[in-house]
Design a protein with these regions (language model features):
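Active-site and donor-binding regions of nucleotide-sugar-utilizing enzymes
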Residues: 1-61, 65-69, 74, 100, ...
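Redox-cofactor binding/interface segments in oxidoreductases and associated redox assembly factors
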Residues: 40, 96, 183
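Conserved catalytic-core segment of nucleotide-activated headgroup transferases in glycan assembly
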Residues: 71-153
Length: 207
């Protein structure tokens, strides 16, 4: 009625879902006719939509827009400032990002011998859920590791082994400070992991 263009962007459709839509083809075709443009993630998805009745003239493969990301310049600048203020240029910074229980414990158990042998290593721990911040802090202390907290405005000191990044909205900052990054959600069942594209966008080697 208002003649507002309707676009389906970053479209993805599995074979199973396509079969389901095909069972209600009348409804599906009516819905697809209402689209002015369909931009699919890949050729397979595009073909499934075409098979369901989408107009080829209004359709094309755009790719996944998840890859079209870049780090905010403000965080890059802040990271450069902190790197200088905290004397991180000569240190190896490993970030454990978006971690779940008991991922921090497993990873710190594996890293502890290296932290004790190599004082130039510092691990940034960024738990996924804020309600776990205090529990994670206590767990780090149980490893007898020198730990500071972002929420207390603690700096990373020469003796700091672990830095608990218990803040919100600063993930880009921690990625920008990293030499290596582990993104959590992948060690637990059912797994799957969280978004690895942000550290990769900063050219940080990511596990």
């Amino acid at each position: 009625y208002f003649k507002v263009p309707c676009l389906l962007i970053n479209a993805r459709l599995s074979e199973k879902s396509a079969q389901g839509y095909a069972k209600v083809s009348g409804l599906t075709q009516g819905m697809l006719k209402g689209l002015d443009q369909l931009l699919a993630q890949n050729q397979a998805t595009l073909q499934r939509y075409l098979n369901l009745g989408m107009s080829a003239r209004k359709s094309q493969v755009l790719g996944s827009i998840k890859f079209d990301i870049s780090a905010p310049e403000s965080f890059i600048q802040q990271a450069e400032q902190l790197q200088q203020a905290w004397n991180l240029a000569s240190r190896k910074v490993i970030t454990l990002a978006s971690t779940h229980a008991p991922e921090e414990q497993k990873l710190l158990m594996a890293l502890q011998p290296y932290l004790n042998q190599h004082p130039d290593i510092v691990v940034l721990v960024v738990p996924r859920h804020p309600e776990r911040f205090d529990d994670v802090f206590q767990m780090i202390q149980a490893f007898n590791l020198n730990v500071q907290r972002r929420s207390l405005d603690d700096p990373i000191q020469p003796t700091t082994q672990v830095y608990l990044a218990d803040s919100m909205g600063e993930m880009w900052l921690w990625y920008a400070l990293s030499q290596v990054c582990f993104v959590g959600g992948s060690l637990n069942e059912p797994g799957g992991g969280h978004n690895i594209l942000e550290p990769i966008a900063l050219n940080v080697p990511t596990v």
